[in-house]
Every structure is written in C-alpha cells, then in structure tokens.
C-alpha cells in the first residue's frame, strides 16, 4: 500500500495539449505530468484514489529537457515524466468542473 503523502506527490498536474484533448475524446485517456521517479503502479493507484475512477492501463515516458541559450550562456531544462492513463469504460475525469 502506498502512503497518502506519496500519492499526493506522484501526480503533479494534468498535461493539456491538442494531442491530449484528442486522446481524451477518442480513447478515454487522460495525460498527467508525474514525478520523475513515479512508477506505473503508483500512478495507477494515485489516479484511482484521488479521482475515484477505475484505471485500465498506464503508459509512461520521460521527456528530455531541451538545451536553451540566454545570450552567451547555455543551460538545460529539467527532464520530466508524462503518464497516459486509460480509464475504464464509462469513467470520466472533469478538470474544468463546470455546472451540470
């Protein structure tokens, strides 16, 4: 069992993009930015407990940080992890939370 404190640290934010919106409509998949050290099992448990939905599968990937320049100085943005969470049939997560 994963502690409640860890569950709250696993999911950082929803990742909203054109691709994630199309995925949500077609495949019932939600995209989250997650902690870089989070496992698929932790992501599945966190989504299931925090949003009270049933999760079918989790796919993860690590986006490598880009090298950026500011004048003569070069730096590197941090790596970050993204999780594609496929929800069970009929399950839904509403991030906007509008009136019903």
UniProtKB/Swiss-Prot annotation:
GO terms for biological process: translation. GO terms for molecular function: rRNA binding; structural constituent of ribosome. GO terms for cellular component: ribonucleoprotein complex; ribosome. Keywords: Ribonucleoprotein, Ribosomal protein, RNA-binding, rRNA-binding. InterPro entries: Nucleotide-bd_a/b_plait_sf, Ribosomal_uL23-like, Ribosomal_uL23/eL15/eS24_sf, Ribosomal_uL23_CS. It comes from the Bacteria. It holds the Pfam family Ribosomal_L23. PROSITE patterns: RIBOSOMAL_L23. Part of the 50S ribosomal subunit. Contacts protein L29, and trigger factor when it is bound to the ribosome. Belongs to the universal ribosomal protein uL23 family. One of the early assembly proteins it binds 23S rRNA. One of the proteins that surrounds the polypeptide exit tunnel on the outside of the ribosome. Forms the main docking site for trigger factor binding to the ribosome. This is Large ribosomal subunit protein uL23. It comes from Shewanella piezotolerans (strain WP3 / JCM 13877). The gene is rplW.
């Amino acid at each position: 069992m994963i502690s409640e404190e860890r569950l709250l640290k696993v999911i950082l934010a929803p990742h909203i993009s054109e691709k994630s919106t199309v995925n949500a409509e077609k495949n019932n998949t939600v995209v989250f930015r997650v902690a870089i050290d989070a496992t698929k099992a932790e992501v599945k448990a966190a989504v299931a407990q925090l949003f009270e939905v049933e999760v079918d599968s989790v796919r993860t990937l690590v986006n490598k940080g880009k090298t950026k320049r500011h004048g003569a100085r070069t730096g590197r943005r941090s790596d970050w992890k993204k999780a594609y969470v496929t929800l069970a049939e009929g399950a839904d997560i509403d991030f906007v939370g509008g009136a019903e």
